[in-house]
Amino acid sequence: MNEKATELDLVNTHFVSPHGLDDDEHYTTAYDLAVLTNYALNNDKFKEIVGIKTTTITVGDYSRTITNTNELLGNTEGIYGVKTGFTANAGRCLVTACKRDNLDIIIVVLGADTKEIRGLDTVNIINYVYSNFEMVDTYNMISEAFENYKETQNINVTKSLEEPQIRLSNNFTYIYPININEVKNLKTSIYTISRIRCKY
């Protein structure tokens, strides 16, 4: 577990046990939990399991129905996981994954006094994000910048110290969540290499 934490660059996380009971050497942060959750959700089986609200386990003649302790699962639009937690020191904790309008978010609430507060804080954050942010595809902005870009200076390099690696490409796209009020302020700039090493 600690090897995986190092691999994911979870610098504020250290595991002592898989059950997570209180220990001075067992700790993490909301950010690290979000990174870990994002990684785990790439595993289809994990994603399936954390999204199950109830299931029945049958062994022989014995059956038992178990219910997910995530009270928001199935009761709040877009939520598809992930995990509740509680210890005396940690308080009520909840890591939540939600998707609305093609925007996936992960919310981490730690140290709540009650399950109700934990759930309310999570829902409030989710509603804030989806009310104030939207996904913006910058492809058209970048393409327009490249179309309008004009080279203003030619440089002749007769004896370069190494093969020049100069490339200008608009064959890419970026999609970001951006505050709705800031979308109109987006600008695209192209910066050229300011110095090329060569000998005369």
Feature names for model-found ranges:
Residues L10-V11, E25-Y200:
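Domain-terminus/edge residues, biased toward the C-terminal soluble/receptor-binding domains
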